[in-house]
Amino acid sequence: MITISKVTFRRFLLGQQGLWPGRRFKGLNGTSQAIHQMQGLQLDPLNSVARSQEIALYGRVLDFKLGHLYQAAYEKRGFFDYGGWLFMYPMQEFPYWRLHMKHREERGMHYEAFTHPPAELIKFVLNELRTRGPLGNRDFGGEAVQAWSYRGRKEASIALYYLWMIGEVMITGRKGFDRIYDLRERVLPSEYDYVAPESEAIDFFSRKSIAYLGLARESTWRTSLAYFIHRDVSRDESKKLLERLIKQGVASRVRVEGSKDGYLVLNSDQPHLSELEAGRIPKAWKSKGPTTEEEVTLLAPLEIVTARGRAKKVFDFEYLWEVYKPVHQRRWGYYTLPILYGDDLVARLDPKLDRKTNTLHILGFWLEDDAPKDEAFANALANGLKRFAELIGAKKMDLRGINHTKLRSYLKKKLK
């Protein structure tokens, strides 16, 4: 078992997610490549400055445009939206996800009114789609179910959601962020319209549970696998599956200095670890534009490397996404984003876009105690803010939320 340094640990996680040492994907094709590299892209409807998924792709794809995601997913049929935690996954994975969908159908739903929608309702919804074509929740009438759901309270809406979760319908596109559904056979490319054998699906998700995290703690790997296949995975089953992966030469165990946790890595990614430990950047990670030392990256709220406590574990950086907290309970701000400089998180800012005046307001800015305060960082911050403003269409910037006087003055000059 090899042991890697903490620096290698965080660089590997960032690099595997396509965030370091800079953007190595470009344009529309690069958008698809980035999502494949990420193993999946979490989607969120909130649009304070841009949606989380758009910010995630801005951080990985040079010349990313807001329309690229929907083009890659819905026009090119490269990805599908799925899950209680809404993600976009490569279309090639759909046959494996049919196992998850099968277990969803067996377990049913957890509404007070029903666990499985009435057969007559299912038949009605499917017939409407078949005869009328792609439809959204708003295209159906119907009675409200006596159980609140943010997905829609109409019976037809819940039936649509159920059919989507069991794989009978798919999201064919979106109006804004509203889902437009259609029958699976009219959305899914025919070469992927089959059910992978259960053993193959479990093997696939066993590997994906490692690839998704880059370096996965053994306990986290088991939890991820259980989510992917939508059933409990016992300790005994987990142990057998893991030992098989190791015996087959698919995965290995890794130690991180200073950590008691055991980690897993795919053997196909081992060369990257070796390069990083030797102080070299893997050739496959070569940036197509400025590096993160030359231009900071604003990280999306739902980034895998920072979400769910990983910011603290990996970077010793406290991060909370506080959009659902009352104002008086927020520590930082409504839509605060971490700032990546080099291979570390050094600051956070709370942005807001005024779409009437096309002004990006920085409502708050917080540097870490050990963050650099030199001209190189200030220049990288200016470059990062400029690219972010271009992404969201901001023509002006209001920097009054930056309380560091010298830094604010420098940025004003650079961003004229």
For each predicted feature, which ranges?
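Long, charged, low-complexity, helical-prone intrinsically disordered regions
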Residues: 1-416
